[in-house]
Curated annotation (Swiss-Prot):
Designated name of the protein: UPF0741 protein GWCH70_3359
Source organism, top-level taxon: Bacteria
Record-linked Pfam families: DUF1450
Organism encoding this protein: Geobacillus sp. (strain WCH70)
InterPro entries (alphabetical): DUF1450 (IPR009910), UPF0741 (IPR020880)
Family the UniProt entry places it in: Belongs to the UPF0741 family.
């Protein structure tokens, strides 16, 4: 089953210009959906992405990528 990443283009925390290429590097075959994820409260304070319908957040993009990589290893 292919992985799915969902990221928000409304929230201020995620920088899509840098985050999306890094997500593609983690899994080139994953589907990436961009749009509101209704995760506004945490999304204003932390960078986040949904990985296979589960939220993953961190204070920095580097930490987020590490957490996502760990999540993908567990799947």
């Amino acid at each position: 089953m292919a992985n799915e990443f969902r990221v928000c283009d409304d929230c201020k925390a995620p920088n899509l210009k840098t985050l999306i290429p890094r997500l593609k590097k983690l899994d080139p075959n994953a589907t990436i959906k961009i749009g509101c994820q209704s995760y506004c409260g945490p999304g204003r304070k932390k960078t986040f992405a949904f990985v296979n319908n589960r939220p993953v957040s961190a204070l920095t993009e580097d930490e987020l990528i590490e957490k996502i990589a760990e999540r993908l290893k567990k799947s």
